[in-house]
């Protein structure tokens, strides 16, 4: 019988979750947690999400990239800390585009308001 590491368990839990809570630090120094739909994960170190270029969380992360992230499923939960990078790369935006984003970004993958 093999025993999974905490990192393996956390990775599996993250894969099951559709929504995570991402917390930025606002200009007053307070945490600002928001629910976010995850697009793609690479282990537990890279988690892709989309948002608006002018959203409060984007503004927060551009001035302070420190973040908290938590996710849970059926009583199991994980809380992580790290840094957020706001990505505007057109190739990545196209690659990670999902049809339901059109409601938020009517210009499609090239909409200047769409960032990762």
Which residues does each predicted region cover?
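Charged, gly/pro-rich active-site loop segments
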Residues: 1-2, 79-116
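Short, positively charged
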Residues: 1-5, 57-58
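Onset of an N-terminal alpha helix
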Residues: 3-11, 15
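A short, Trp-centered hydrophobic/proline-enriched beta-strand micro-motif
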Residues: 12-27, 67-70
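Short glycine-rich loop/turn motifs
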Residues: 19, 33-36
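General beta-strand recognition
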Residues: 21, 46-48, 79
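Residue-level signal for well-ordered, solvent-exposed loop/turn and beta-edge residues enriched
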Residues: 28-30, 83
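A short mixed-secondary-structure module that forms the rim of ligand-binding clefts
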Residues: 39-75
């Amino acid at each position: 019988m093999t025993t999974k590491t905490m990192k393996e368990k956390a990775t599996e839990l993250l894969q099951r979750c559709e929504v995570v809570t991402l917390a930025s630090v606002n200009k007053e120094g307070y945490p600002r947690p928001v629910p976010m739909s995850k697009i793609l994960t690479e282990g537990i170190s890279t988690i892709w999400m989309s948002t608006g270029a002018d959203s409060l969380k984007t503004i927060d992360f551009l001035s302070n990239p420190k973040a908290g992230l938590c996710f849970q499923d059926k009583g199991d939960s994980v809380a992580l800390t790290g840094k957020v990078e706001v990505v505007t790369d057109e190739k990545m935006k196209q690659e990670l585009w999902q049809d339901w984003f059109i409601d938020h970004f009517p210009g499609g993958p090239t909409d200047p308001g769409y960032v990762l």
